């Protein structure tokens, strides 16, 4: 596995970090891009990666009333679509784990599913988030 910056966790050539900051989806994505070259909100490409991210979030989230939800790098770009065609890092969606398909536009992981299912929330709400580089 690749060497990660201090405080980042390594998994299959990528580095991940949960940030206990409340940000809107767009601000969280911008924050991730500022952490390192190629940084973005986390994209989840397999069940194995989903399980890794779920464990990382569970272990690193600081408990507050806002920690029931954590942004991932997926946003609905068009009300007519159920999902956008790509993650915020530009990679295509080849693994999916939706819990419901409403058009609240931005997706994240929900505590009551042990951070394993993708749930739609309003992009403008501030929540914790996970970055990947």
Curated annotation (Swiss-Prot):
Q: Which UniProt keywords apply?
A: Disulfide bond, Hemostasis impairing toxin, Secreted, Toxin
| Leader peptide range in chain numbering | none
Family designation: Belongs to the snaclec family.
Spell out the note in the miscellaneous section: Shows greater sequence similarity to the alpha than beta subunits compared to other heterodimer snaclecs.
Tissue-wise expression:
Expressed by the venom gland.
What PROSITE patterns does the record tag this protein with?
C_TYPE_LECTIN_1 (PS00615), C_TYPE_LECTIN_2 (PS50041)
UniProt keyword Repressor present: no
Q: Specify the protein name.
A: Snaclec A7
Gene Ontology cellular component?
A: extracellular region
Q: In which domain of life is the source organism classified?
A: Eukaryota
Name all C-type lectin domain ranges: 11-132
What biological function has been recorded for the protein in this entry? Interferes with one step of hemostasis (modulation of platelet aggregation, or coagulation cascade, for example).
Q: Where in the cell is it found?
A: Secreted
Q: Which GO terms describe its molecular function?
A: toxin activity
- How does this polypeptide assemble, per the annotation? Heterodimer; disulfide-linked.
An example of a Pfam family matching this protein is Lectin_C
């Amino acid at each position: 596995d690749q060497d990660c910056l201090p405080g980042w966790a390594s998994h299959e050539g990528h580095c991940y970090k949960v940030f206990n900051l409340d940000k809107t989806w767009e601000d969280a994505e911008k924050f991730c891009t500022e952490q390192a070259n190629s940084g973005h909100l986390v994209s989840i490409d397999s069940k194995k990666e989903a399980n890794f991210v779920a464990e990382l979030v569970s272990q690193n989230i600081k408990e507050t009333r806002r920690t029931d939800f954590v942004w991932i790098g997926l946003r609905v770009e068009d009300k007519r679509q159920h999902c956008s065609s790509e993650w915020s890092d530009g990679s295509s969606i080849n693994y999916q784990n939706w819990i419901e398909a409403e058009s609240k536009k931005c997706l994240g992981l929900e505590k009551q599913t042990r951070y394993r299912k993708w749930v739609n929330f309003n992009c403008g709400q501030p929540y914790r988030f996970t970055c990947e580089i």
